[in-house]
Amino acid sequence: MSLDETLSWPFFDDGHRRFAETLARWADATLAALPHDDLDAACRARVKALGEGGFLKAVVPAEHGGLNRGLDVRTLCLARDILAFRDGLSDFAFAMQGLGTASISLFGSAALKARYLPPVRDGRAIAAFALSEPEAGSDVAALAATAKPDGSAHLRIDGTKTWISNGGIADHYVVFARTGEAAGARGLSAFVVDADTPGLSVSERIAVIAPHPLAKLRFEGVRVPLANRLGGPGDGFKVAMATLDVFRSTVGAAALGFARRALHETVERAASRKLFGAPLAELQLTQGAIAESASEVDASALLVYRAAWTKDQGAARVTREAAMAKMFATEAAQRVIDRAVQLHGGLGITKGVKVEELYREIRALRIYEGATEVQKVVIARELLKNRSGKSALAAE
């Protein structure tokens, strides 16, 4: 199913359809001309272009010049779906602007919002979300970085963060550290830290199979005003989970965009490639692969936009729905893209061919913002928790 067909679903209103149509036209006219060779420059160029085009307004609330009253998850998902179909780095640039500011939008003071959101909205500043550590990725409660009091109005952050998207080019980081109010998850707090703060350094740039700016950060006595805290003391886990609750569905949307493009490339290839004197598409095994991919694309779209719609209707949390969307869409996209590579034959593993690029792009999505295995645990726990609640009600 194409995006146009998806937009006919009742999940969307006319505002979503206008946004999608405008972004798609802009992307088709703009993205191909942006630089690709220098990774940092390419990412900066995409942030600037998205800001100038007005599309980063989707990651900022209306009170600070944004597009919607709050963070409209359907709009965020549509943007990632559309951008991923065309250019993985553009999807990344959009997504990280949102992930690196959502915590500020949701939990920041009026002063923090006024300071950090407008530059991101306009593409003048680059945002980042610094959660993962060498020994704490999906297990957020195991974070070891500390933020200790330094006088009455400051804290000092010490520790290491790794796998930080936009690391090395960001203007600010949303950083999570242990402040010690309680053991485990309840002892974390979140802060906005400017990239040029003394003691904050990039200790390593990390190269991955689908290149994007990624780094390990070192915090050595990084002095941060207490006013830069997001939420209250000990609210860090809540801040992280609320942010991921919004953006986890959008990871599924990016996977959906990659899968849509792979299916498009597969259909075009199967129709035009001659094999044994006839189009590849006439072989039943080819038709079976196309049918499986098309079904998985549609199922992914339903899960992604169901989760986004549910959140936008006012649900406090969509933990189960977002986990299902991310888990299914990323795993399905891997299968869809793998079939596309196979049906392209030798071209499928040739650098510069679109399906080869997609094969590298999709792999990380099954890991970041909660690996597939973690999503399975989350889904099961949500179901078991709900069952326990119903059992208690039945016993009364």
Predicted regions and their residues:
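Flexible, small-/acidic-enriched active-site or ligand-binding loops
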Residues: A142, D196-P225
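Short Ser/Thr-interspersed hydrophobic loop/turn segments at strand-loop and sheet-helix junctions
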Residues: G54, A79-A84, A177, V193-T197, ...
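Alpha-helical interface subdomain recognition
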Residues: M1-F85, F107-A110, P119, G123, ...
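A short core secondary-structure module
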Residues: H154, D158-S201
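A structural signal for short hydrophobic beta-strand segments in well-ordered beta-sheet cores
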Residues: A145-K148
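Hydrophobic, small-residue-rich alpha-helical packing segments that form membrane-like cores
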Residues: A136-D139, L155
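Long, acidic (Asp/Glu-rich), low-complexity accessory segments flanking structured domains
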Residues: E220-V239
